[in-house]
Amino acid sequence: SYFRLKETIESIFGMPYFLPTHQGRAAENVIFSALLKAGDIVPGNSHFDTTKGHIEFRRCHAVDCTIDDAADTQKELPFKGEMDIAKLEKLLRENPREKVPCVVLTITNNTAGGQPVSMRNIRETAEVCRRYGVPLLLDSARFAENAYFIKTREEGYADKTIKEIVREIYTYAD
């Protein structure tokens, strides 16, 4: 039932409001229909292909702010799907707030080969977004895998449960 779904979602993510959709593409369509207008700029860490398609369909600009190391297939890093905080901050500083309706952080970063994003990077991305008054949206298609990588690769999270890590992740989302 709807009420069991609501209870489960709130218990996992800590968020009381949600809109069920049958797939990620539909969710993107709903949210971008409400948030974007022609000419807007949507920064992110390598937008997934359907995400980029929904943004560009609305005559907006999907801007990649992924760390440069994500493109180096020979370099091994524990978190290679991260937002480049300096690139994001530069974009937000150089564009009017009304032209940037949101920032999209994809966890894990599918376009960069399913690379995870650290909790530190999620937190820093959220801090920058809040400083500029821009909502942070999480593309959460693979949130559980990302939480697992945080648990196994990031200092300070080995003793936390996946649920605790997920709850922390979503404290940074809008």
Which positions does each model-derived feature cover?
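Conserved PLP-enzyme active-site core in the AAT-like
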Residues: 4-174
